[in-house]
A protein has these predicted regions:
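Glycan-processing catalytic domains of CAZymes
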Residues: 1-246
Length: 246
């Protein structure tokens, strides 16, 4: 058959099959996929090479040293009924601890909100306090049997496509974090990383950007029986941060 207009996924370790199918189906380009790489045998076989990169993940070494530069989101606790004029709400009780970590910096706390959901009235900051050690918010002077919520900023500590591949494709490797390109330090790091990537991938003819900066919003719960709390496959929930709000 003719050659051209067809891109074939390939993978290191499957050279013979990849090149056989490329010839049989008339591929003009071979590409990698999330979690796969192409061997020299494939990249030097005379085909165009598409290389996949996600700018904001797979930088765990840098992310571990700059954990205040991770992407964030707002989380809101489920409404909880008060049985007296005081109430304590565990912020992460309903959320997946492998995905989120509370951002309890002084700058972040300025944007936390506690609401009486029965009356839809915001609780004054003087009427609640945060316990860092317990990860909980305690309310006082509230109305018994009204329901209350806390919205707070949380760091994302497990990138969602990495989560998806672990749970769907049974990956068994380090959880990938995602970094936020809004920060000047992150931008400087990423520009250097991109320059190095281009220099070390001379066989690449097309770069396939995937997931870009913020995408694929998954918010998982702590209960295995109710893991998927919210999903949106094209969203901006994860663009928020203290610098963005400022």
């Amino acid at each position: 058959m003719g050659k051209g207009g067809f891109t074939l996924p390939g993978e290191s370790g499957y050279e013979e099959l990849t090149l056989k199918m490329a010839e049989k189906w008339g591929a003009d380009v071979i590409r990698d996929s999330d979690g796969t790489v192409l061997s020299d045998e494939i990249t030097h076989a005379g085909y165009g090479i598409y290389s996949t990169i996600c700018i904001i993940r797979d930088h765990n070494a840098w992310a571990k040293e700059n954990q205040d530069k991770l992407q964030q989101t707002f989380l809101c606790t489920p409404p909880q009924a008060a049985e007296s004029d005081t109430l304590t709400i565990g912020l992460m009780d309903s959320f997946f601890a492998e995905q989120f970590r509370i951002n309890d910096s002084a700058e972040s706390l300025e944007y936390w909100e506690v609401y009486d959901r029965t009356t839809n009235v915001k609780i004054d900051n003087a009427d609640w306090s945060y316990d860092k050690e317990k990860g909980s918010v305690s309310l006082s002077g509230i109305i018994p049997f009204h329901k209350y919520t806390v919205s707070f900023l949380a760091y994302r500590i497990w990138e969602e496509i990495s989560m998806y591949n672990h749970t769907t494709n049974h990956w068994d490797k380090e959880h990938l974090m995602q970094i936020d390109p809004r920060y000047p330090e992150t931008q400087e790091y990423l520009l250097g990383w991109m320059k190095h990537w281009c220099e070390t991938h001379p066989d690449t003819t097309v770069v396939r950007f995937t997931s870009m900066f913020y995408n694929f919003v998954w918010i998982w719960g702590s209960s295995e029986r109710n893991r998927n709390l919210f999903s949106d496959w094209g969203s901006y929930d994860f663009t928020v941060s203290v610098p963005a709000l400022q």
